[in-house]
């Protein structure tokens, strides 16, 4: 603030006239001054000069006081100066020491880098030496032949576990030396003759051991799978030969295939011969045709001296399936039939059971042998299939021959169809086991079966077509009840449908053709037999009863969707419609004729021609009013007695009554036409509701 005052005083002395710029300068200086000091100066009222002098005086006093203080404390200040100089020297030495330490640290860091580099080189040398040591040790181990291994190869029996381990070691040494090559190692040249000698000794022992095991397959009644298991445990024997003596390996392979082929041939030939002797004595024969009439045994002296043996058998099993279809599901993979045990227990079997047993035996041996060949001989794909086919070719041929002979003797269509389905299921089994399916074999067997099945079914068709109807007549007429030939047909058809269901597949085109031909032959027979009925009504009743029998036997959820069921159902409905018209004709035939003629004229618009029926209305109404109640009673009593199936009879009765009411409604509608409106007789017709109330009395309670 004193400086401000001085500046203001000087400015006032020099120039009393203030400009705007000088005023602004003064104000800016004033703002920078201490506000309290400014207030104090203004409050004192002193001028700038007085303030200046006062400040100068005070400054001089302060200067003198400071100088005096320094003089009074000169010794302390001198000591402080000396101390500061001493500290500077200490700090200078400390700085020099730190610089020296820094230089030493730099040299230590460089030494550490050098040591680290040396350590890396040493570590690398150590690793290289260790690798060389490992390789060298392995090489020494590979070429070194221990006395223990030599003694084991030469003296130990091939069945001993130690021999197998020594053989592995020998194979390992020879293989590695061959992979490495001889090189310049002298030790290899010294070792190889020893290894070659041991290899020859091992080849001889292994070959003899394998041949001995294979010769055991030829022993009668031996379980060859036990020997195969022993071979698999020593599979490395063959692998050793395969690597070191290919000629011996091929010799053993050929020997095994030849031995196992002969063994399977003998086994299946003996098994088939004994198995098919267990066939049931009461199987179907050529005489058991669908249309066969006479099943009676010959009687009298002719029967006594007859050389032919007659077997009494249950003919129901010829055409009905019973539980035989279980062979496709629950009994499919059941135990094989053991011939000698079955003979001791006096058991006999249907052909399909014998067929299943021999084919299952073939499939099991076929699958097992394929897996053994691929596992033991280390082959796959085409090579494995070729070896397998060689091993099973003879067995396949003997099974085919045996089956062909037995199939050619069969007259059982159900059994043949079951065998066809069995072939399909065995094919699926082989696919599940991931074994070649031998499609040629199954196609051949299936071809035999289809050929025989078509022949047997053709025999059935021809027997139906050649039925002598005169032998079926009693007292000059045929019974209207279901015929036994039709029942046989229905049971046989139901059997085929159940077999198709049990097989788990849709019925093929071949089987559908067989069933359609069978249905066609039965339809022709029914047409011939119905023509021999005495009345048209009996003809329809005969057809309905027989068609209903067929549908009732094959009636199940699966069969309802088959073509055969649809055909028979359509034929039955047509016969029912014809029968309904035939039943109504004697009772309201006059009304039916009137309704049909008038409706035709009304549709065509021939009103003038319709007028002439006015005179007939009275006769129709009078006849109906007089006869409708007795007609209802007569229809009921007659219809119930005609049909063997009570449920069918009541259903047809309700159909007749429904048609009866429909004709009344149609007749009533015709009477409402303008042409008949003025005819007073129209109002005399019995009300249709009254007729319906009467009909309700005959409605079944269930």
From Swiss-Prot:
The keyword Transport applies. Belongs to the VPS52 family. It comes from the Eukaryota. This is Vacuolar protein sorting-associated protein 52 homolog. One of its GO terms (molecular function) is small GTPase binding. Keywords: Coiled coil, Cytoplasm, Golgi apparatus, Protein transport, Transport. GO terms for cellular component: cytosol; GARP complex; Golgi medial cisterna; Golgi trans cisterna; perikaryon; perinuclear region of cytoplasm. Ubiquitously expressed, with particularly strong expression in neuronal cells. Specifically expressed in head and tail neurons and in the pharynx and ventral cord motor neurons. Pfam families: Vps52_C (PF20655), Vps52_CC (PF04129). Its main location: Golgi. It is found in: Golgi apparatus, trans-Golgi network; Perikaryon; Cytoplasm, Perinuclear region. Component of the Golgi-associated retrograde protein (GARP) complex, also called VFT (VPS fifty-three) complex, composed of vps-51, vps-52, vps-53 and vps-54. Within the complex interacts with vps-53 and vps-54. Interacts with the small GTPases rab-6.1 and rab-6.2. The gene is vps-52. InterPro entries: Vps52 (IPR007258), Vps52_C (IPR048361), Vps52_CC (IPR048319). Residues 505-535 form a coiled coil. It comes from Caenorhabditis elegans.
